[in-house]
Amino acid sequence: MMKKIILSFFAAVLLITVISSFFEKENTGIKTKAALGKKLFSEKILSKDSSVSCASCHIPQFAFADTVAFSKGIGGKLTTRNTPSVLNMKNRPYYFWDGRAATLEEQALMPIENPDEMGLAIEEAVKRLNEHREYKMLFNKIFKEQPNAKNLAAAFSAFEQTLETVDSKFDDWSNNLKELTAQEERGRELFVGDKAKCFDCHRMEDFTNDEFKNIGLYNGKELNDAGLFNISKKETDLGKFKTP
């Protein structure tokens, strides 16, 4: 009997060692806050029913946005807005369509606890990460502390700050490295000219002026999303949204 107990003990130790080695091997490439944030960006346990992640709506192949008018959250529930891109978000003055977040860190946690999106209290999200062997190990390795709301937001922020578009064809054209096709040049002229007037709002190197605009769709009836007004409570902000 004693021999069986000893063998069982050593078998358990061996199994734990193998599992630990597996996790270490799997995560040798995750050494930075940004790398951890990238992994968390696709992590579904951060939603109430573990069905959606940040990447469910911020889809990489669609410029970290999606292709529908209203994005879907937990349980397939439609949200009230579509998903903005998270590209080129570094050093923006505010975030979300209505500017309700002042920093990337503040922005990062809001979708998790939004009942229409991921529907999970931040306290529960942190609890799940602490109960998850792999994530607990990664947070301790990178932040030198267990998962908490602050370092969770920091990881997301670090990842999102890496999502900069610096090598597009337009960038190359701006730096005299490539020529635009005739069709692309016509599009550029339309974009910056007085006919379409896109450039009035979509200017600067990231094609945004970081301002709020009302393009005339809000009517307070069937189109009743008041946008910035919901945050500022100023009548002049009715129907205004951040320039993407």
Where is each model-derived feature located?
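Electron-transfer interface patches adjacent to heme c in soluble/periplasmic c-type cytochromes
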Residues: 21-32, 44-52, 63-180, 189, ...
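Hydrophobic face of amphipathic alpha-helices that form TPR/SEL1-like repeat modules
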Residues: 39-40
